[in-house]
């Protein structure tokens, strides 16, 4: 019985001034190389575009080759590039015992909103799986919006999280909502 070679995975990070064609340029290189795009997250923040990709290749494939192929495209797009080899235990999907919830926070912009909310969640062992913030409203009346996707540990409930965040809601003078994400089976 022959052993299958281990599939190599890399984390690819690309950051730079936003412009059209970034995703197409990077994904074209990955396609030409025969890489599979497993997970990705792309966003624009204050005119800067950032993408993080988890890519795999079924055959032995060096990190330096991947870098050498991506670097000219990144240079032509004015993007910085970083690569990291991932070990097998780093790419396994983490199953959560508890529920997945979305927490929304919004109110007048002020320092400390992210810190206060996330430190309270961390203190209770709640893992943040996604976090986005945005300043909306007008220059005269800015409104800060934060959306978090969290995985509740065993024993925590959405109602319990609402209770703990109720104190912060008053202290920070913000609105905080918690809702459960219902998984969909495919």
Task: Label every PLM stretch briefly.
Residues 1-186:
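A conserved regulatory-domain signal marking ACT and ACT-like small-molecule sensing domains
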């Amino acid at each position: 019985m022959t052993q299958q070679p281990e599939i190599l995975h890399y984390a690819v990070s690309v950051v730079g001034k936003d412009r059209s064609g970034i995703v197409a340029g990077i994904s074209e290189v990955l396609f030409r190389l025969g890489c599979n795009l497993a997970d990705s997250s792309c966003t624009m923040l204050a005119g800067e575009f950032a993408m993080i990709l988890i890519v795999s290749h079924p055959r032995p494939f060096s990190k330096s080759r991947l870098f050498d192929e991506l670097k000219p495209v990144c240079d032509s797009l004015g993007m910085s590039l970083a690569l990291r080899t991932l070990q097998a235990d780093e790419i396994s999907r983490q199953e959560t015992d508890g529920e997945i919830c979305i927490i929304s926070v919004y109110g007048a912009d002020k320092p400390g909103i992210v810190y206060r909310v996330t430190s309270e969640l961390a203190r209770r062992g709640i893992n943040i799986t996604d976090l986005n913030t945005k300043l909306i409203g007008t220059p005269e009346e800015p409104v800060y919006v934060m959306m978090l996707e969290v995985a509740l540990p065993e024993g925590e409930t959405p109602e319990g999280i609402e209770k703990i965040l109720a104190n912060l809601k008053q202290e920070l003078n913000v609105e905080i909502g918690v809702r459960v994400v219902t998984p969909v089976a495919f």
